[in-house]
Amino acid sequence: MHLHFTPRQIVEKLDQYIIGQKDAKKAVAVALRNRYRRSKLAENLRDEIAPKNILMIGPTGVGKTEVARRMAKLVGAPFIKVEATKFTEVGYVGRDVESMVRDLVETSVRIVKEEMVVKVQDKAEEQANQRLVEILVPSPEKQSGFKNPLEMLFGGAQNSNQTTDSQEDVEIEKKRQDVERKLAAGLLEDEIVSIEVTEQQSSMFDMLQGTGMEQMGMNFQDALGSFMPKKTKKRKLSVKEARKVLTNEEAQRLIDMDEVTQEAVYRAEQLGIIFIDEIDKIAGKQSNSVDVSREGVQRDILPIVEGSNVATKYGSVKTDYILFVAAGAFHMSKPSDLIPELQGRFPIRVELTKLSTDDFVKILIEPDNALIKQYIALLATEGIEIEFSDEAIRKIAEIAYQVNQDTDNIGARRLHTIMEKLLEDLSFEASEITLEKITITPQYVEEKLATIAKNKDVSQFIL
């Protein structure tokens, strides 16, 4: 957990990946810092302070989801994104709203489990290597065949075989030590070994996906799994692959799942972030049955956001201190079209601005994961060094902005489409090109994109 970041530091970290949207960054930075402040309070006062949920308003592709996702990643908090339109009112077929909390807990369990695996990794690998030694050079007990019960009872012939057995033990021990050295030195990585692994059984409840009954299926499967023996199967793998499989198995054995569950539920309750996208799609006046159904979903979401207990397979989870970030474009509706009770649960309102040509230029080159950097790295694997002139980058940004204006405005996502079309021929022929360095000029951009961008009928299908 990295809750010690100040709001300014959080904004600076977000600036490395997201261009603009200062208001949204400040809002989430303050929300995160308040969690740190709350953790320092006395318990009686801490219980009274709930997070201030955030409503982000802005068109698609301007960074609403990315701000929330990067914020969660920055502090290592459990984070999930759900779409409000996927939920149905209680009593109808579809996902119930409580599933978002169950998904959050599952994410939290996965995060904690991965952290625990890292802690026991060295010990797990050591035990996996011991199992590999046992497979390559079985111990005398496993090599020995059937023993006569009378011989075991009366000890007849034991003395006569004792010397031979002792010599065999010494020889086998030498072999085991030799194999251990070779394994440590990586000299046996390509050797093929036969190992027994736990078989991954396909779930008979996959058919329940999307029906709202997944939790019932999972609980039933867990109940069955607790008393049904796990199946194993033999697999032939190289030592390198076998070590990975065995290390994973040993790590799972070393982890205390009760400890994982306890920590995961705590993190989900105290640090969890749920991003509810497309909340504008369930807003509307009660003019028809569809809007009434949408209001039903809002009323189902309300107790989750207000604070309630949700039953999960890991136990009851309180939602009182989970941070909810809702987002929507609100083209066809307004935030005031949400039911008043739900509006009141999102006191912080942030409006994200549309992206300009200058924003597109910055998005292409400034973030740590900028698109230009990605394409340069991809083509470098083919031995080709490409560079973009400043004028070419400006031209790409102008075309992306213009296509957004002429067709549907999908924000920064338009740049992905533009860049793919621009470098389509180069990517296709990269393995055959003999040139080591290629410069992308405004003329090249014009040649590849201008004709398509100017033709609205074509651009809406291609770009």
From Swiss-Prot:
Q: Report the main location listed first in the record.
A: cytoplasm
| Record's GO cellular component terms | HslUV protease complex
| A GO molecular-function descriptor | proteasome-activating activity
**Per UniProt, what is one Pfam family of this protein?**
AAA_2
> Any idea which UniProt keywords this protein has?
ATP-binding, Chaperone, Cytoplasm, Nucleotide-binding
InterPro entries associated with the record: AAA+_ATPase (IPR003593), ATP-dep_Clp_protease_ClpX (IPR050052), ATPase_AAA_core (IPR003959), Clp_ATPase_C (IPR019489), HslU (IPR004491), P-loop_NTPase (IPR027417)
Please give the SUPFAM superfamilies that the UniProt record associates with this protein: P-loop containing nucleoside triphosphate hydrolases (SSF52540)
From the UniProt record, give one GO term of the biological process aspect: protein unfolding
Q: Which residues bind ATP?
A: 19, 61-66, 277, 341, 413
Q: Does the keyword Protease apply?
A: no
Q: Where in the cell is it found?
A: Cytoplasm
Physiological role: ATPase subunit of a proteasome-like degradation complex; this subunit has chaperone activity. The binding of ATP and its subsequent hydrolysis by HslU are essential for unfolding of protein substrates subsequently hydrolyzed by HslV. HslU recognizes the N-terminal part of its protein substrates and unfolds these before they are guided to HslV for hydrolysis.
UniProt subunit comment: A double ring-shaped homohexamer of HslV is capped on each side by a ring-shaped HslU homohexamer. The assembly of the HslU/HslV complex is dependent on binding of ATP.
For this chain, the family text in UniProt reads: Belongs to the ClpX chaperone family. HslU subfamily.
Protein name, as recorded: ATP-dependent protease ATPase subunit HslU
